[in-house]
Amino acid sequence: MNVFEPRLSSWLENAGDDDDVVLSSRIRLARNLKDEQFPIYEQKEEIVDKIAGAFDDNFTLIKMNQISHLEKALLVEKHLISPYMMNKSEYGAVLLNEEENVSIMLNEEDHLRIQCMTPGLRLFDALEAALQIDGYVEEKLSYAFDKQFGYLTSCVTNIGTGMRASVMVHLPGLVTTKRIKSVIEAIRSLGFVVRGIYGEGSLPASSIFQVSNQVTLGKTETEIVEDLTQVMEQIIMQERIARTTLKQKFHIALEDRVFRSYGLLTNCRIISMREASDAISDVRLGVELGFFEHISRQKMNELVLFSQPAFLRREAGRDMDELEEKVIRAKVIREILGDK
């Protein structure tokens, strides 16, 4: 297993429910060990070894102080560790399985953050996998738990279940028809949070949003997932209606926008991250509307991931200035689309 190779994790490679709109689902459980200082106050390297010792050979342990900054950035771009872990976790580590759909961060804000990812809208599958791992760990190690408040976490917004359920969605229809603001306001009024592609602290870009629960106390894991699933089903329906409206009422303008973006990606020699992201979003919409039968969703995911800065530095084998990065990005995009 070489997690730093340019390949898609299984949750980006495989098909999932409603994956014309939903890119992925994720369940994250925050846990801390009983009678140990939380990592935000004191990080102990022996905590990593203690937790890692509870897992078998199906998981690979990667310690943050044993890899380069570039390798950390690659893990962030693959959504296997958080930006917080990359920048602030001196004695942090991550346990990964072969498929890269399970990521267990150690010594992040909490002692453990168990993440399970699935393609499309499959929150219940992710929940089942996360709870199975959680139960396995709890058989071997004692968690910090309070009868009144549930699982104790570094951030008070996570106490209770300690669970964050999140869904990554592509909503170009709602963005283009200018209905996205009212949809986001409705989502927030129901107690959910809308963020960017890298979660907390990141801004939505290129019509990609992350929707997650805000409440972790007073509801069970199943209830939280049921509520988020219902919200997502409404968002999916609204996005599909918006796409249909665009195709029926503004067909020529939509085709022009999509094919201009395709032309840019297949012919560019210099392209910025923002320009590439916007064009990839347009082409992904075109793929979903049947304009490009030769381009798969998997190919679109490759474009998103491998045009990121860390993967480009890996491709070049060195650090680059801004212009060099734009040139390499254009080259990688053309190669993925078969137009070298």
Swiss-Prot record:
Enzyme class, broadest EC rank: transferase
Domain called Phosphagen kinase C-terminal: residue spans: 21-242
Domain of life (superkingdom): Bacteria
Reactions catalysed according to its record: L-arginyl-[protein] + ATP = N(omega)-phospho-L-arginyl-[protein] + ADP + H(+)
GO MF annotation: an example: creatine kinase activity
UniProt keyword annotation of Nucleus present: no
EC number: 2.7.14.1
GO cellular component, one term: extracellular space
SUPFAM superfamilies: Glutamine synthetase/guanido kinase
Family of the protein in this entry: Belongs to the ATP:guanido phosphotransferase family.
NCBIfam families to which the protein is assigned, alphabetical: PRK01059.1-2, PRK01059.1-4
Function summary: Catalyzes the specific phosphorylation of arginine residues in proteins.
Family annotation (PANTHER family): ARGININE KINASE 1-RELATED (PTHR11547:SF38), ARGININE OR CREATINE KINASE (PTHR11547)
Name listed for the protein in its UniProt record: Protein-arginine kinase
Source species: Listeria monocytogenes serotype 4a (strain HCC23)
Encoding gene (name): mcsB
